[in-house]
């Protein structure tokens, strides 16, 4: 059950990340902020995936 919740969290992070990237792209902040936000979300998603695999091992 816990594993399903983690996978759901990852999917929500991906949807939220894509939505925020779209909204940031619509504004005039420039590519620097866009790249920063993209790296931030990739780091969060990678951390969540790592958590899922460490939980499934134990």
UniProtKB/Swiss-Prot annotation:
Species per Swiss-Prot/TrEMBL record: Bacillus subtilis (strain 168)
Compartments, as annotated in UniProt: Cell membrane
Keyword Membrane: yes
Name this polypeptide is given: Uncharacterized membrane protein YdzM/YouB
Transmembrane segments: 7-27, 29-49
UniProt entry keywords in alphabetical sequence: Cell membrane, Membrane, Transmembrane, Transmembrane helix
Keyword Membrane: yes
GO cellular component: plasma membrane
Source lineage: Bacteria, Bacillati, Bacillota, Bacilli, Bacillales
Recorded topology in the membrane: Multi-pass membrane protein
């Amino acid at each position: 059950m816990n594993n399903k919740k983690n996978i759901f969290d990852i999917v929500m992070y991906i949807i939220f990340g894509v939505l925020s990237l779209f909204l940031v792209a619509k504004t005039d902040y420039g590519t620097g902020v866009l790249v920063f936000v993209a790296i931030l979300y990739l780091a969060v998603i990678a951390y969540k995936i790592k958590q899922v695999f460490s939980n499934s091992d134990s």
